[in-house]
């Protein structure tokens, strides 16, 4: 029984932890939390469940339905803080009761807010949790909970959560953070969309209909020669905009209020089809009142991705402004009610069939309230005591007023006609007013002016003229027709002038575009269908044929298949070394074995060198900090300088994009001496062995030399000779074990980490003694500057390796050791750059796919030739941002202008992590493989800067969401962080390839 009760308590506490985490994340992202945030409601519900758990009946009140009110009232008698909450809640409840007018829906009232300076009305959810919510906003909820935990015997049973000596204080401690946040009532511009998560925004976008085409309409045409669309494209754009507004209006926002909503309202769009059920809603904005009806198939998302079917149903959707409606016909049947809207031009809208149950009368009641104060129904609905709104009961006045309501005999009327009138306004059908609204001035159009000529006999000369252009000078029609003719001619000149200057600006800009974008893509287009089959990718059969007959397969054809279709997973281990440059296409098996042998020898040599230096680093750490001997991960360092560096580095979170390293290594006097060099020269170089270079040994002069040339391989050769003489048997075993890095933990496990259990203490002590002897022999071989640099880099590597892709099945402790060995080997050869956070993210997929330490080391070295420029010591990131700015400014000018207006995030800093890690953290692991191999193949097929087009494809994939929600810089970072690992990688690649092709065509002007 006790375990079940503990499980309930843990579940309640876990719910509170989850909601606290959500609300703290929102506060960090947006710098504030709105009082109407859904996270506040969820947190209040979770806390209330904890407070009501095993609450005594005496404390809850025997007859009170609101247990929270009873609890706070009782606690308020002895706790001053809770007493203040009681007074505030009573004031809120009195205000809510005092602002309830009859005939106005509560939903509309709640959305209106406070116009009189009083506190805004609370939502039903907020009223439900008003006690906890008020205590939270007043920042005293943690104090109230702490008081309840300390005095639990008065209010709770023994099994209650707050009566638990552990769970009670924990609950109070959890609420300290939310009680320290700032809560606001202001309706900021970004509040209305930031409440929904990224997934909800994407779901709303999918409901609207099929995804917009790539060349979506913008304020100005995109550069390039585009085919003319049919006249139906304009209607498609209007339908898309209507669909977007319809879906957004179904959710509450700052622009409109939802006055009425009813599902399963039937509409028969055509005579030859059945009635379609849908969602009917009535929306009120500051200027207008609009009726909307959306088919249920679109609301439920049951149509899938069929663009044709969605477009058909969007044709059925209704959006009717009531400013265009003059009268409403209502018919009541036993099965329900029917409503027909009649527009100003006499056209009847499709009938709306309401289900039975008074829904038609409810709609008319909300409509009448929405028309106020400017408009009203004629005749108005009647108010009957005890029933509310009812249909009017009118008698026939005369035969002239046949339009008015009348009773059908002595029975109850079933058919009604209501007019919509606006008292105090001029007649709705005044044509001059309509023209003025459209900006054409007060002149009447021709179809309104012609009757003026036909009235009377003053214009007979005009009608008797044989030529339509020959009008007598005394004709009275001239003053009426002349302004219209001048207006049309002026409009024609303006249209032609705008078209000409737009074309001229386009041509002038095109030359500039070619100059800026020509370097981003290859000018020769390699299509996927010549020869066909490239979209299937590089399969196992094609690769086996290439292995058998390499002369008949061209490298470009293989790369084309990889670019358009990817690589079959089974052969990635064999193909990736070719894509990264470890092997060259066309190599024989013997040549590949020679390359592998050279790389393996080089890797083992580097492994031994940095491990020897690591022994010295560890010895110096033990001498400097004996108290922290068993806490290497805390960042123990050699001197105060490195201590400050490590302390600064330890504060960097892995959730940030990159840790910027300000440490500057010593400037070498000779570029050849900036890193350790081998004593022996490598053999004749073979293709693909760029890692191995011929280097000369540098003689070591004195141990006091502070020159960077002391980082040479004559030191390592001295260490190696001491090993050969048997000075450290333990280290020889480590060196030998390093040769089989792919089969188990690397040697670093013995030299870096402290023993995890007492059974390992003795072997570790022996190895430490051997390391001390070795350190005593060769400690003078390294400069203090070098040792400090190595210590700092080892600390950073160890910290990142332990948290690198922890949830992926491959990275068990032995494989993490292998990852560390490869990473340390690379950094040892590039100490001038050092380790920067993010490098492990680039190495991990290579090790997973290749599953070979030496091969991963070589491929990673080739990969870093391109990627190292993205890190702080390189300058490629600024170039990426500038190119992204040019691309989106040219290909999507409307989105670029939006970015420039909303805080000017056209510097594209939100792409930093994308470029730094080649989208590693944005995609699932399997998708990372597919994207990376396309990036590598694209260097030879379409563009050496294909990462730019993938980044642009990510932005374009969510273009409408970004534009519709008017996102600023913070919003777009939050959106893409939430969408990480939820992207459709194949769709992103398809868009990226299309963008490359578009730029190629733009440059060629085809």
Swiss-Prot record:
In what tissue types does this protein appear? Widely expressed.
Q: Name one GO biological process term.
A: late endosome to Golgi transport
Q: What is its main location?
A: cytoplasm
Is Cytoplasm among this UniProt entry's keywords?
yes
Compositional bias (Acidic residues): 661-671
The terms describing its cellular component in GO are: cytoplasm; melanosome
Q: What is known of its domains?
A: The Rab-GAP TBC domain possesses GTPase activator activity.
Q: What is this protein called?
A: Small G protein signaling modulator 2
